[in-house]
Structure formats: C-alpha cells, structure tokens
Amino acid sequence: MEIDVRPFSGDPRPFFEAVELAFGERMRDDSYTHYAAIFEADRAIAAYDGDAIVGTAGIFSFDLSVPGATLPAAGVTVVGVLPTHRRRGILRRMMRLQLDAIRERGEPIAILWASEGLIYQRFGYGLGSLHGGVKLDRDRSAFRVPHQPTGSVRFVNADEAARIFPAIHDAVLPRRPGFFSRSPGFWEHEFFPDPEHWRHGAGPAFHVVHATSGAPDGYARYRIKEDWDAAGAKSTLNVVELIATNPDATLDLWRFLIGIDLIGRIEAWNLAVDDPLLLSVAEPRRLRMEVGDALWLRVVDLAPALAGRRYRSDGSLVMEVADEFCPWNAGRWSLTVENGSPRVEPTADAPQLACDITDLGAIYLGAFSFAQLADAARVRELAPGGLARADALFGTDRAPWCPKVF
C-alpha cells in the first residue's frame, strides 16, 4: 500500500503513540497530557499506512535569539518513523513537506535537537551549537579567586519559580544566541513538570533564586541523587538549568550549589561551552567537560536569514552556496553590511568562498568560524583573504547555547 504523507488531522493520541513507538517507548497517560497541552496540531505532519500513523514530525513556533536580533524559527520536534516502515523514504518525504511549509510561513531558519546528527545533515542542517557536560568532585571544587557573594540565594517552590524564572530567562535571551522564546504553556508543561521518569533516579527538583539588592537576577533548578556508604554521603547534585543575567549572579549560584553539604559530585549535562565555571575553579583539570552537539540549524531561506542577524563589522562578501534539498538557496550571493545594516541579494560577481548550506548552519549562530570549516575541508577559499573577510563579518562574542531540549 502507498504511504501517504500529509498534514496531520484528527485525534492526536494515535499521533503521539506513534512518536513513542518510534523512540522505543510506550505512551504514558501523563506523557500524553504533556504532549497534548503544547501540541501545535496545525503544524504537524504524519505518514499514513492506510489509517495507521507510521511517521510523525512536529514543530514548535519559536522566536530564536541570533547574533544581534531575534527571528521566527521552526523548532522541529517529535520526528520519527516506526521500525516497521524504515528505509522507505518516509522521513525524506516528511522533511520535504515540512521545509516547504516552513518557508511558506516565512520562518527563515529551522532548529532541532537530533537523536542522530547524521540524519539531518542530509536535509541541510548544520551543527549550530555545542553543549558542555561537566562533572566536578566537590572536594576539588575550590575557586581560584576569592569571591564575596554579591546577592542572596533563597529556595522557592515551583509556583513561585513559575512567576520569577521566565523574566530572568527572557532578559538573557537577546544576549545569548541559541535561546528560544518559551510560552507560558512551554514553561508549564515542558520545564516545571517533575515526573519520576524524568529524574533518572534522582529526587524531586529544587528551585533557587538569586537576587541582587532584592531584584531577582538568576535561578537554578537541580536534583540530588542520593548515595551513602559506610563513610557517609557521596550524593550527586544534577544541575538541570542555571541562568543568570550577569556574571556575579552566575558565580554566586555556582558557589551556592557547590557548597551544599552531603554532596560528593556536581554534574551538569548542558552548559554553554564558555560557561565561567571552568575558568573559576582552582583545578580546572578536575572539572571534566565532555562537549557534544546541541542545536542543529537549517537555513531555510538564505536571504532573510542572513539579513535578519547582525554582523561584527561593515564589509562585503560574495559566497557560492550549494543546497541540494532546498535549491532556492543555491547559487551566488552577495552580503553587504553598511552602517550595521545587512543587505543580501543574488549576484554574478566572483565569489570569495564556496560552502554548503550545512556550513552556513554551523556558522550562523557563531558556533564555528569559516576558517575552522576550511581547516576541516568543508569551506573553500576562492580568493585571497576570503576567509578572513567572512570571519570579520560573522564573528560573535559569545558561544551560542540552547539550555533546553525540545
């Protein structure tokens, strides 16, 4: 029977049952409640074998922080194909329909967290940001520079956290590429729920707020996985999210967490790769960081995507871009920045460099430079100084960071 790929309609429960099956899980009632509360049904795509859903793809409508601006972005999620229907081209057909719809909607970029990064490079996604997972033994966690707290830290319950955390997050968003807007429903159903199967053996979540002169400017959410032996406690503190509007509040929160008694180790699986913790501890060797892929970014519509972010300096660049899956992006493009305002248009001028659309996805938020990609044999310099010219334009001051999987 022919597989029909089309916009989803109908009862969402079979859709999410297919999502769970594709990821090797079974639908829980609380999982369905969580999905249904934030599901954008009008943006979902399904593959049907008869009446049965065998493939799924969804989208969150986000505003994404990009260098110097925010842009509408499609947050691609719940993408899967049942094991019974793999290797039939279903994913490719869903990606085709989805990217066409994203472009038609006017979203110049799409982002996702990938279960397997190799999959999405076929459809033009590039490695848009990294995350750092850290492990630090508490007995070797002394800070290098003595630090007097600049504010206070207090515990809050989930209801009070829900009133305080969003404003702090939103204050940081425009300053950190990779942050995306969180709707009230996203906070309620994606961040604050604390079911046991989300805890991975740890206890319930704790929430703390940092305030300077009485004004909240940072927060942390963490869990403790208890572990005791004859020598005493050696529990692990897992940092779920730590966000602050200024460096002092960030360090105060880290000092508070590291100072909690009965803890043997502090772990955080998703920090910015330029988080100040690594340079703050006296023994950086004892802070073990494992860097991994985070956001994958697809430049869906090249001209508005490049015109929608800001650049480090004025200048101009001509690029030859290859894009097999979205051919409207392929060709020679001129980027001109004058008085901080970018202009992007097709051109017949000679290019200074050549790249694939996946390379622009890796460069767009500032995770990598053109020179780095050239060293990896991905970007080709076609005119002397082309790489330096490109990096002078696209360079950023902060590493991109996406603190939340979606």
Predicted regions and their residues:
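Intrinsically disordered, low-complexity, positively biased terminal segments
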Residues: M1-R13, D49, V66, R144-F406
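Glycine/alanine-rich phosphate-binding loops at beta-alpha junctions
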Residues: M1-V78, L82-T84, G89-R92
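N-terminal membrane-targeting/anchoring modules of bacterial envelope and secretion proteins
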Residues: I45, I53, A57, V79, ...
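Conserved acetyl-CoA-binding loop-helix of GNAT-fold acetyltransferases
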Residues: V76-D100, N246-I258
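Conserved GNAT acetyl-CoA-binding A-motif
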Residues: M95, D100-A114, D261-A272
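Conserved active-site alpha-helix within GNAT-family acetyltransferase domains
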Residues: E104-I109, W113-G133, D252, V273-R288
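Flexible glycine-/small-residue-enriched beta->alpha junction loops
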Residues: L127-P149, V156-N157
